[in-house]
């Protein structure tokens, strides 16, 4: 990994006021963490920083930071931008030693076309970055995962991947990295038969809500009691 040189100056004032004045001068505040010392607060040119991190590594870019004549190796770790202007407002660096391994997140990139995709499956990436331990100048740009032989319904775990030369995976080995999912089938609702106007309900079925009651002249069922207040015709015959 090639190193880019970045110049900065140490700052003694912290807070919103001093940071605002720095930005008015065309500089931004930054902090260097790590090592056995307290964090170092510096000021630097944002345009120079953006140019220095125009590398495939991005957040793991190794830089030589020169602060008031003293040099230290750092990794670019984080930044803050203005939500409206998108201008760089702040940056964070991690100080490293060139002979001591560090742990960093390295992005996962799939290579090839999965066999399961040709069968109608859907390739999904479950783990987008893997923690890798390596010397600062051996940090890989990406972890390439060959998915060519991956069939539908199958997956690849961290334990099945080969770490780049000079690196160790510091990640749970049983984690799924990529898989080919079985496509979901759309369920088609069964058609509902439309009711025929005037059709009698099935035997034992209750009439639909709002349906008319039986006609007044309809005979009651065998053995049924007469309606309340109605006359029993059989009783009239008995009186005669």
From Swiss-Prot:
Record has NAD as a keyword: no
Top-level taxon of origin: Bacteria
Molecular-function GO terms, alphabetical: 5S rRNA binding; structural constituent of ribosome
SUPFAM superfamilies: Ribosomal protein L25-like
Transmembrane residue ranges: none
GO terms for cellular component: cytosolic large ribosomal subunit
Stretches for region Disordered: 1-21, 204-240
Keyword line: Ribonucleoprotein, Ribosomal protein, RNA-binding, rRNA-binding
Basic and acidic residues bias (residue ranges): 230-240
Residue ranges with Low complexity bias: 204-229
A single BP term in Gene Ontology: translation
NCBIfam families: bL25_bact_ctc, PRK05618.1-2, PRK05618.3-3
Family affiliation: Belongs to the bacterial ribosomal protein bL25 family. CTC subfamily.
Assembly notes: Part of the 50S ribosomal subunit; part of the 5S rRNA/L5/L18/L25 subcomplex. Contacts the 5S rRNA. Binds to the 5S rRNA independently of L5 and L18.
Stated role: This is one of the proteins that binds to the 5S RNA in the ribosome where it forms part of the central protuberance.
Protein name according to UniProt: Large ribosomal subunit protein bL25
Organism this protein belongs to: Anaeromyxobacter dehalogenans (strain 2CP-1 / ATCC BAA-258)
